[in-house]
From Swiss-Prot:
Signal peptide positions on this chain: none
Enzyme Commission numbers on file: 6.3.4.-
Family: Belongs to the TmcAL family.
GO MF term list: ATP binding; ligase activity, forming carbon-nitrogen bonds; tRNA binding
Organism of provenance: Lacticaseibacillus paracasei (strain ATCC 334 / BCRC 17002 / CCUG 31169 / CIP 107868 / KCTC 3260 / NRRL B-441)
Entry protein name: tRNA(Met) cytidine acetate ligase
Role noted for this protein: Catalyzes the formation of N(4)-acetylcytidine (ac(4)C) at the wobble position of elongator tRNA(Met), using acetate and ATP as substrates. First activates an acetate ion to form acetyladenylate (Ac-AMP) and then transfers the acetyl group to tRNA to form ac(4)C34.
Gene behind this protein: tmcAL
Residues where ATP binds: 7-20, 101, 153, 178
Length: 378
């Protein structure tokens, strides 16, 4: 069976995502569309507005055949690490083609990735503490490969291409033109809105009828929503009670940020105010949110490394076509394929230990078990 894969967050699923899945299937002439989707937490450093099962269900109803979870250890990362986690998972699923939407589908992404293969991504080129890492990275890209575009989806596509190049058997890259509003912009264009706009409308109880598939309008209205508003008290408690030595063990903690975070938390009444207090030219808001989320979830560097050493494919759902594909490849996959979560998988040394730890807060807030005993949606 011909397969095409996509990496997504679906935060939440909307008409632009339905278009992207249809384009991927059409352009790749694929029988099966495999999606690696962020679990309950997303790259911008916050909980997804709906839990992973709700978002997977929406995707399966609108073009995806299989949805596999991108675990928190890969989902809440900077672009290159996010891309690596998603690309390796798709490759482990036996996917032939990697499709992604971009502002620049005409670009030869594989060629650019080869030019960047020897570019130094740390060291002297990244010692300007008045600029973010992303700004300095763009300068390195421009020097190494003449890259001047900085559109978010172009840069993410480039990260996909670099991760794909590192595979033993790279997938075919299939960039296609995005349609509608830009990444994280607010607004609506041709009945397609950014996920940011959809989240804004949902949280304000405004109608999303024009910008999400019709059958999802009432479905979304019934679901528990998640945001930093619910998580901030947990972050505050962690920062006020944890020892500095504990905070230094958190994944992505660097350069004395534990001092800055603990000094600024007492007076902050919400996440927005806290981020303004700790913001500097060196770090983007997304970088700081990711660190704050890692602190909240007690996501240590050790736990992240352990999870990466034991990769697995946690299937959230599949269609009949997806089931057929899984049955045909399940004995040939390099990674374990998980279709039912047992207690031993969630144990401290289990393959889903970090996912379970992170998801417990979602379960506490929403009252719906996220892992134990859950079977794939069908």
């Amino acid at each position: 069976m011909q397969t095409v894969g996509m990496i997504a967050e679906f935060n939440p699923f909307h008409t632009g995502h339905a278009y992207a899945l249809a384009q991927a299937r059409k352009l790749a002439q694929a029988d099966v569309v495999v999606v690696v989707m962020s679990g309950n937490y997303v790259q911008r450093g916050e909980p997804a507005i709906f839990d992973k099962w709700i978002r997977a269900q929406a995707a399966l109803q609108h073009g995806a055949d299989i949805v596999v979870e991108l675990p928190v250890t890969g989902a809440v990362q900077a672009a290159d690490q996010f891309a690596e986690a998603g690309v390796t998972a798709l490759a482990a699923m036996g996917v032939n083609t990697l499709a992604f939407g971009t502002e620049h589908p005409e670009v030869a992404y594989a060629d650019l990735a080869e030019k960047l293969a020897t570019a130094a991504l740390t060291g002297d080129g990244f010692r300007d503490y008045t600029q973010t890492y992303a700004t300095q990275l763009n300068a390195v890209y421009a020097k190494a490969a003449g890259i001047t575009q900085t559109d978010p989806n172009f840069m993410l596509g480039l990260s996909y291409a670099k991760a794909n190049l590192a595979l033993k058997r790279p997938m075919t890259l299939l960039p296609f033109a995005r349609r509608g509003i830009g990444h994280d912009e607010v607004g609506i264009q041709a009945n397609i809105a950014s996920a940011s706009t959809v989240r804004e409308y949902l949280r304000a109880d405004q109608s999303v009828e024009a910008i999400v598939p019709t059958e999802l309008v009432d479905f979304y209205a019934k679901q528990q929503q998640y945001s930093w508003a619910q998580f901030f008290p947990w972050l505050k408690y962690r920062l006020q009670t944890a020892e500095l030595n504990e905070l230094r063990l958190v994944a992505t903690m660097a350069e004395g940020l534990e001092y800055r975070f603990t000094q600024k938390i007492d007076d902050a009444q919400d996440m927005t105010a806290f981020l303004k207090q700790v913001k500097s030219k060196r770090y983007t808001y997304a970088r700081l949110r990711r660190l704050a989320l890692a602190i909240t979830l007690n996501m240590t560097a050790t736990a992240v490394n352990q999870a990466r050493q034991h990769p697995q494919l946690h299937v959230l759902g599949f269609t009949p076509t997806g089931r057929q594909y899984l049955n045909s490849v399940k004995h040939d996959l390099d990674w374990p394929l998980l279709t039912k979560v047992s207690a031993d998988m969630l144990a401290p040394d289990g393959v889903l230990a970090m996912t379970h730890r992170a998801d417990r807060l979602i379960t506490t807030i929403g009252g719906v078990e996220q892992n134990y005993g859950r079977r794939p949606l069908m």
